[in-house]
Amino acid sequence: RIVQAVAPRPGQRLIEIGPGEGAITLPLLREAGQLTVIELDRDLIPRIQAAAQGVGELEVIHADVLTVDFTALARGGTLRLVGNLPYNISSPILFHCLEHAGAIADMHFMLQKEVVERMAAPPGSKVYGRLSVMLQLVCRVEPLFRVPPGAFTPPPKVDSAVVRLTPLPEAERPDADPVRIERVVRHAFGQRRKT
């Protein structure tokens, strides 16, 4: 279902963050013909490369995704990002991607369901917070579908969900320093429990 939601087409610059054992890597590669993966775990890279033999053109970047310059990687075009993000560092990865929104066409991520709910929360909602504000200032956030624990081996203790993030046109994004906006939002939501 993730691959159907992404609907990759040949010629698009598709980047998978953290392919792990390659559960969605091969279906993406089959559809797109070429795929770049960013993987930190050096031990997984040969397995992914071996599995991709004869399926399509696979480029592997061995790096921490938080150090990857997506704007440079786009080479003047736009990227489509996909990934089953590690739940413990999903927010830093999302904020890092926002820094490169101008080089990204869309993002499809599987995350903990509660994180997706916070990302898409409307103002006034109990779960509306810093993550909601920062993402919605830059992207359209569309929760797509829930993924039950049984879809994984071993099954996690939490439900997951897939979300689509589509960066807004530059004219619709705030014309202000993102660092300053983030500081104000962090301060505002840091104070809300004290009132």
Q: Which residue stretches match the model-derived regions?
A:
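Catalytic cores of RNA-modifying enzymes
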Residues: 1-187
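Pseudouridine synthase
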Residues: 188-195
